[in-house]
Amino acid sequence: MSELIMNEKTDLEPQVPSVLPLLALRDVVVYPHMQIALFVGREKSINAVDVARNSDNLVFVVAQKDSLTEEIDHDNLYQYGTVAKIVQVVNHENDENCIKVLIEGLHRSKLKKIIDEDSYLTAEHELSPMTINVDKATQETRLQELRNLFAQYAEAKLRNARELVAAANKIEDLLQLMFFVATRVPLNIEIKQKFLEYDEFEAHLQELMNYLMNQSAEQQIEQTLHDSVKRQMEKNQREYFLNEKMKVIQRELSDMNGGAEDDVAEIEKRLAEADLPEHVRKKAEAEFRKLKAMQPASSEAAVVRNYLEVILDTPWNKASKVSINLNKAQEILDADHYGLDDVKDRIVEYLAVQSRVKKLKGPILCLVGPPGVGKTSLGESVAKATGREFVRMALGGVRDEAEIRGHRRTYIGAMPGKIVQSLTKVGVKNPLFLLDEIDKMAQDYRGDPASALLEVLDPSQNSKFNDHYLDLDLDLSEVMFICTANSMNIPEALLDRMEVIRLPGYTEDEKVNIAERYLVPKAIKNNGLRPKELTIHEEAIRDIVQRYTREAGVRNLEREVSKIARKVVKEAVSKKSKNLQLDVTSANLPEYLGPHKFDFGMAEDEAQVGRVNGLAWTSVGGELLTIEVAAVKGKGKFITTGSLGDVMKESITTAMTVVRTRADELGIEASRFEETDVHVHLPEGATPKDGPSAGLALTTALVSAFTGIAIRPDIAMTGETSLGGRAMRIGGLKEKLLAAHRGGIKLVFIPQDNVRDLAEIPDNVKEGLEIKAVKSIDEILPLALTSMPKPLPKTPIVKPVEGSKAARH
């Protein structure tokens, strides 16, 4: 056979030109003795076919390495290809720019060079026939082995196995049979190309036979698995048939409960009428089929029946109409709450966007503020303003994740979580959800409810919220969530999903306004009084705020107002008076509420040495903070009293250093610091005090104590100080300035960096105070002290020695 090929090469080589038109193929390898139909669409390839047809119908075909590349170059073509003969050319039925070419492979050939003829490509090649280095008997053996292996493979993998096996049995040439088989197995382009490139015939044949043997082994394993699965399916079908037969017998023999039948019929009717998403309906119908096959009195039937009722009660597609009337919404918010402008603006902004964008994911607002400032009631007002149903979910003390996500149905007494329960209660899928006290959640061995809320509060994830009980995706993207908290003690991942709006607490003027507009009319109505029977004057309300309550919100203020109303009702009932008309003023207020509960911070009338007014921020607002410093003869000891925190103690140390660095300018001899004991005291010792914002006030008080110069009583100051005496920015400026205004202060010193915060200060406060922004303590002392100390005379550091001579170097 090898001699035949060699003779064939000798005879044909002069007949095959060394340069032929080139056809580059995608994902196809053409072997000798192989016929294949090709769809040719590239312009140069079509031109190459035309050139070949006009000469000897011979072309050089070779596979591309990268089939996605449009341009043809030598680097993207394999080294070996095939000289092929064009048998037939037909135009494509549906594409004018494509032709169908039937070719027959003739000889293996090696690509040497590509020549660009402008309109088509040619290939310079060299014929490279394969050699068979085995004797005749071995060839016959290999021929039969390859036929047998291909027959096994074809019967297992190929559709037209009988025709292909018959065709293979007719082939007597081993080389031709090898190429015939290689074209019928699903090998990738790299492996098929390797078959063409093998110089040794035996290696080519062995690779192909190994592949066929591996495929036969895989087929045997697959057949074994198929038989095993078939036997198991027959067993399962038999068990299913027997179980169904048993259920039918049980239904016939059991005493059927009419009420249970009615329940099933009712569920079937509701299921047919319900508006359910496709995935929910499929699940519900599957569960209903199970229910009909069960005995109605069984516990399993009760579980399935409850599950179906929850599905049918859940508002999957029912939504309430959301109001987008901005003016009406603003009126409702203003009528229900005084102040809280940031929150109102955010709600109105959301409604404005919703009026333009029909589909908008609900915002996640988190209102953080002290108790009693109206966080929860604000949620109700927002629901009313937007036309949404209102749902309040208290999270205080919740420790179990199942409270949020529900229990799985496998547990006895399982039920859905509070999210699904609340939606079922209101009957719509777009309510306003108020998650109250979100900072009060805890965790234990039952799970972490805060982590369960991560999915609920993420707008990009809550469209597919999965409750453990339902085990179905529920869309929460149209729910508007508002969370409330007293502090920022919220898990970081949860906090990141929310837009935090801080409610710092009401100012004194805001509390008075709220009492006049809301609390007093409410107390009169709730206690059965008529408006003309009780009048509480503004100065009395202000007195209640200052001397009977100390809070950031208005709850205690409401209690005190209600207390007055109850006493008035008692007086009216006891006297049986029909024309009762009482005025509550600042003068007669103690008759109703008793003596004052709190001292109202007021500035001193006289200037004192070592005593200065600081300004403090507390959870219930701002206060005047008196700072007292006494300097007495001693040994340089430093004493602090008044329940001071570590930060304030460090601030005192810093202030002392600031004074010592300015000792000469302030007229303080250096020895004074070693011979004087300093005592810093902040009155109301039972109240803990901390923070760095008293630095400027402490420095001023220390200067006054060491110099003996008094400090003006009508000034106050706030600000942290650096070692160089620079005034540094502080927080809570609004509350502090309100306290200064309330306490009769005339001049307030604030750091220069806090000027930007003055925009938040009410105009009546700014008009009643002289606010001076300073950069350092040096700007405060001339205005705060009643007089400036005289600096010490400057003395040279080194005194000259009489008669000394200049040093020589």
Swiss-Prot record:
GO terms, molecular function: ATP binding; ATP hydrolysis activity; ATP-dependent peptidase activity; sequence-specific DNA binding; serine-type endopeptidase activity
Residue intervals of the Lon N-terminal domain: 20-216
InterPro entries with a match to the protein in the record: AAA+_ATPase, ATPase_AAA_core, Lon_bac, Lon_bac/euk-typ, Lon_lid, Lon_proteolytic, Lon_Prtase, Lon_prtase_N
Keyword Membrane in record: no
Binding-site positions, ATP: G369, P370, P371, G372, V373, G374, K375, T376
A GO cellular component entry from the record: cytoplasm
One GO term (biological process): protein quality control for misfolded or incompletely synthesized proteins
Source taxon at top rank: Bacteria
EC number: 3.4.21.53
Keyword Hydrolase assigned: yes
Enzyme active site: S693, K736
Localization (cell): Cytoplasm
Predominant cellular place of this UniProt entry's protein: cytoplasm
SUPFAM superfamilies, sorted: P-loop containing nucleoside triphosphate hydrolases (SSF52540), PUA domain-like (SSF88697), Ribosomal protein S5 domain 2-like (SSF54211)
Subunit and partners: Homohexamer. Organized in a ring with a central cavity.
Job of this protein: ATP-dependent serine protease that mediates the selective degradation of mutant and abnormal proteins as well as certain short-lived regulatory proteins. Required for cellular homeostasis and for survival from DNA damage and developmental changes induced by stress. Degrades polypeptides processively to yield small peptide fragments that are 5 to 10 amino acids long. Binds to DNA in a double-stranded, site-specific manner.
PANTHER family: ATP DEPENDENT LON PROTEASE FAMILY MEMBER
Family label: Belongs to the peptidase S16 family.
UniProt name for this protein: Lon protease
The organism of origin for this protein: Acinetobacter baumannii (strain AB307-0294)
Gene that encodes it: lon
